[in-house]
Amino acid sequence: MGIPMGKSMLVLLTFLAFASCCIAAYRPSETLCGGELVDTLQFVCGDRGFYFSRPASRVSRRSRGIVEECCFRSCDLALLETYCATPAKSERDVSTPPTVLPDNFPRYPVGKFFQYDTWKQSTQRLRRGLPALLRARRGHVLAKELEAFREAKRHRPLIALPTQDPAHGGAPPEMASNRK
């Protein structure tokens, strides 16, 4: 006396459904690329800012950047936090006096360290869909030429109309030259 085929198939399908749910729960984290990666890093790191590559002192093996790790491999919260910059000092921490910078010290971010405010405008531009060509100063002339080309292409007639009406006694010049 064996198990009926219908019941064994039902048991098999039930097992496969539970197995696929368990595999989906333990699968590696998702990958993050481009703007999603930047937005996630901004959310995770907050005001601390973040690096695209870890400083050499933290990593003993060949250094891979956050893009290579999160875009091409799986990415989780612990990995994202390793790319956050060192936390800013709290307002209560007055153990060391503030550092006085010389007047000729550059005021722009140096290296691969980015603050949230500098990325905020870039991500807003990306969300609006402005191409990089329009954001560059030297690209404005090229952008105007591209727009003029698109405008001319948009208003091009579908067919070329003859210059003379053939019904009223004259064929177009193209037709007259073909008959000779």
From Swiss-Prot:
Keywords assigned by UniProt, alphabetized: Carbohydrate metabolism, Cleavage on pair of basic residues, Disease variant, Disulfide bond, Dwarfism, Glucose metabolism, Glycoprotein, Growth factor, Hormone, Mitogen, Osteogenesis, Secreted, Signal
Region feature Disordered, mapped onto this chain: 161-180
InterPro entries: IGF2, IGF2_C, Insulin-like, Insulin-like_growth_factor, Insulin-like_sf, Insulin_CS, Insulin_family
Database matches in PROSITE patterns: INSULIN
Region feature (C): 53-64
Signal peptide region: 1-24
GO BP annotations, alphabetical order: animal organ morphogenesis; embryonic placenta development; embryonic placenta morphogenesis; exocrine pancreas development; genomic imprinting; glucose metabolic process; in utero embryonic development; insulin receptor signaling pathway
A Pfam family reported for this protein in Swiss-Prot or TrEMBL: Insulin
An MF annotation (GO) of this entry: transmembrane receptor protein tyrosine kinase activator activity
Outcome reported for the amino acid change (mutating residue 48 to E): Does not affect integrin binding. Defective integrin binding and IGF2 signaling
Ranges where the record places region B: 25-52
Any GO CC annotation of this UniProt entry: extracellular space
Record's subcellular location: Secreted
Gene3D superfamilies given in the database record: Insulin-like (1.10.100.10)
Membrane-crossing segments per the record: none
Tissue expression as described in the entry: Expressed in heart, placenta, lung, liver, muscle, kidney, tongue, limb, eye and pancreas.
Result for mutant: residue 92 to A: Decreases mature IGF2 levels
Glycan attachment residues as annotated in the record: 96, 99, 163
Propeptide cleavage-removed residue intervals: 92-180
Claim: Disulfide bond is one of the keywords in the record: yes
Role, per record: The insulin-like growth factors possess growth-promoting activity. Major fetal growth hormone in mammals. Plays a key role in regulating fetoplacental development. IGF2 is influenced by placental lactogen. Also involved in tissue differentiation. In adults, involved in glucose metabolism in adipose tissue, skeletal muscle and liver. Acts as a ligand for integrin which is required for IGF2 signaling. Positively regulates myogenic transcription factor MYOD1 function by facilitating the recruitment of transcriptional coactivators, thereby controlling muscle terminal differentiation.
Subunit comment: Interacts with MYORG; this interaction is required for IGF2 secretion. Interacts with integrins ITGAV:ITGB3 and ITGA6:ITGB4; integrin-binding is required for IGF2 signaling. Interacts with IGFBP2.
Disease: Silver-Russell syndrome 1: A form of Silver-Russell syndrome, a clinically heterogeneous condition characterized by severe intrauterine growth retardation, poor postnatal growth, craniofacial features such as a triangular shaped face and a broad forehead, body asymmetry, and a variety of minor malformations. The phenotypic expression changes during childhood and adolescence, with the facial features and asymmetry usually becoming more subtle with age.
Family note: Belongs to the insulin family.
Protein known as: Insulin-like growth factor 2
Organism: Homo sapiens (Human)
Taxonomic lineage of the native organism: Eukaryota, Metazoa, Chordata, Craniata, Vertebrata
